[in-house]
């Protein structure tokens, strides 16, 4: 019913998740080839991730000597969540790790805001800038204004398709009208923008058109992973050359399934 307070006894469950993993899970379900280029570190959380990857036959592309972090997800009765995060190996990239990638084998790349927040040496941004053929999907998340501004602008100038919710785009653009906020962000990115609106669906904007796609009615149990499943579906559908209206209808359908159950994945 509420966030925990003094002397509360809280039941905990440990499960694997995270933005990139949740997106990869959707891609896998939709038979879309992908590589999960995410560091796996040490410690109890690193061991937990490593065991899960082995069970699911997910290749570990990066082994880090740093400890893995974790994220406490507190979910209230309405399904809304609060995150308490300890950033670990999964958020810190090294330039040499990208040497194993042949960028010509890829068409699309998904980037989460948390990685960019910790990308102090800008190795992720440098890789993306070096391969302009890649279509970038960027989900900055609620930490959009915590990312160092100069670093964030470097990424936005690479023309990513930005995926964020209404509160996030309002806070970033300092606007309170959705179409004006999208127009403001578009002036920077010059690429499509998708804004998720919770129970009201989502909104698409580019220089030629804008439209609203209604949500699928469902009973909300847990909103963890809703945005990840939405952008994951978009990436999978666009890789199959699906048009934007149909793509967003499908994304809303998958997101509604995710929020109707406990956990961040289907």
What do these predicted ranges mean?
Residues 2, 178-266:
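Conserved phosphate-binding/catalytic region of the ribokinase-like
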Residues 1-37, 48, 220-221:
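Glycine-rich phosphate/adenosyl-contacting loop at the front of the ribokinase-like
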Residues 51-63, 76-210:
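Ribokinase/PfkB-type carbohydrate-kinase core domain
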Residues 37, 84, 213-214:
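Hydrophobic residues at beta-strand termini and immediately following loops
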Residues 72:
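C-terminal catalytic lobe of FAD-dependent flavoproteins
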Residues 30, 66-69, 198:
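Short, basic and Ser/Thr-rich N-terminal targeting/leader segments
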Residues 39-41:
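Alpha-helical transmembrane segments within multi-pass membrane transporters and channels
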């Amino acid at each position: 019913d509420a966030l925990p307070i003094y002397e509360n006894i809280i039941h905990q469950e440990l499960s694997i998740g995270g933005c990139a993993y949740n997106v990869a899970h959707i891609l896998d379900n939709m038979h879309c080839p992908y590589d999960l280029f995410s560091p796996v570190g040490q410690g109890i959380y690193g061991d937990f991730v490593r065991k899960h990857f082995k069970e699911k036959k997910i290749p570990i592309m990066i082994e880090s000597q740093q400890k893995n972090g974790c994220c406490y997800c507190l979910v209230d009765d309405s399904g809304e969540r609060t995150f308490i995060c300890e950033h670990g190996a999964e958020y810190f990239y090294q330039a040499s790790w990208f040497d194993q990638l042949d960028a010509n084998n890829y068409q699309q790349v998904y980037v989460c805001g948390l990685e960019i927040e910790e990308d102090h040496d800008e190795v992720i941004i440098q890789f993306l800038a070096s391969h302009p053929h890649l279509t970038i999907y960027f989900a900055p998340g609620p930490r959009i204004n915590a990312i160092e501004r100069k670093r964030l602008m470097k990424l936005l100038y690479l023309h990513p398709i930005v995926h964020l919710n209404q509160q996030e785009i309002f806070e970033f653009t300092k606007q309170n009208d959705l179409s004006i906020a999208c127009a403001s962000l578009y002036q920077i990115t010059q690429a499509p923008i998708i804004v998720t609106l919770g129970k009201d669906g989502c909104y698409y904007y580019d220089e030629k058109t804008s439209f609203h796609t209604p949500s699928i009615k469902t009973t909300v149990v847990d909103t963890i992973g809703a945005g990840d499943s939405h952008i994951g579906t978009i990436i999978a559908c666009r890789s199959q050359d699906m048009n934007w209206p149909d793509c967003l209808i499908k994304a809303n359908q998958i997101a509604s399934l995710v929020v109707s159950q406990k956990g961040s994945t289907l």
